[in-house]
Amino acid sequence: MKAEIIAVGTEILTGQIVNTNAQFLSEKLASLGIDVYFQTAVGDNESRLLSILEIAKGRSNLIILTGGLGPTEDDLTKQTLAKFLGRELSFDPDAVEKLDRFFASRPDYARTPNNERQAQLVEGSTPLPNATGLAVGGILEVDGVTYVVLPGPPSELKPMVNNELVPLLSTGQKLYSRVLRFFGIGESQLVTILSEMIDQQSDPTIAPYAKTGEVTLRLSTKALSQAEADAKFEAVEKEILSHKTFEDQSLSEIFYGYGDDNSLAQVAFDLLKSQGKTISAAESLTAGLFQATLADFAGASAIFSGGFVTYSMEEKSRMLDIPLGDLEEHGVVSAFTAGKMAEQARKLTESDLAVSLTGVAGPDSLEDHPAGTVFIGLASAAGTETIKVNIAGRSRRDVRKIAVLHAFNLVRSTLLNS
């Protein structure tokens, strides 16, 4: 089924309101296995709406119109659709009764004749009751094309779609997705590595998305059940993870989890919790961002001991008890300083692990290190590890954010290998 969404309202075209209905409907239809091919916005104008309907009829077999069901003269969606289909308008008895109840306790002058328009339907339509408003929606099929009319206010449209429209459109098959998350590889490299799979994709489809510092692959398929979809996903996922990067690293090693709402921080937090480990941190360029991210999770106090924000060399020395001479000798942007910061944070908080971040957020260089140079340390009972990452060509904000992602990834890999 090819679906098309037509939003009716001049206020959308002038930018007075954002068309959130289109996003909601597209997501809802996708979950039902219905593909949305086109989205259109048209003003409150009969001739332009008629021309759009003519175009839509030739390319779509499900046309959903939103907005223009109110009582005023510029609310002309149902009237224009009726004209387009060569049909009359009729009154829905339940909608009329709802109008009667609504105006029963109001002065007589409140119910003007134009209010009756809200109870009208294109002849032959199945009414879609409006649980939160007065304008009734409708659905009808003409010459192989299904037309749906919905109110514009999201507070009215969403309940109508969820409670009335979805049961009528359910076809049995639904759209299922599985999101694979990767860290440590760019989108262009991942797409190049998987180019043959992506070029030849059919079912499931494979869609890459770049996010700040990481890449996701969305696998999508239509199936009658989650079990059927999972069987398809497993085969494709196994093939994806069998590929290697240009550095001969398996994609399975940089794959870290599933889901739209997952994150490296979430994975690291869950591992700390499941292993009963505590963690602390000492941060310089990230200024507490690692610790703040940890604290976002409910129950963080069970694994997060506390930490330090030591932005200057003097504070690194004073708060972490690192000799100032050592810091001056090695520099604040160094593997030595990152290692010492992690070791001292672990010692002072008596935590199982401690992370440190020091580097150059930019835009200027520091100690002959270019912007984006970051050293990350991780201290544990097994010893201290430091890594250097180069986050070039990014804003200060992105450098700090990506540095924190690297820190969580270091925690994740350490816990998995411990």
From Swiss-Prot:
SMART domains: MoCF_biosynth. Coiled coil: none annotated. Pfam families: CinA, CinA_KH, MoCF_biosynth. Belongs to the CinA family. NCBIfam families: cinA_nterm, PncC_domain, PRK00549.1. This is Putative competence-damage inducible protein.
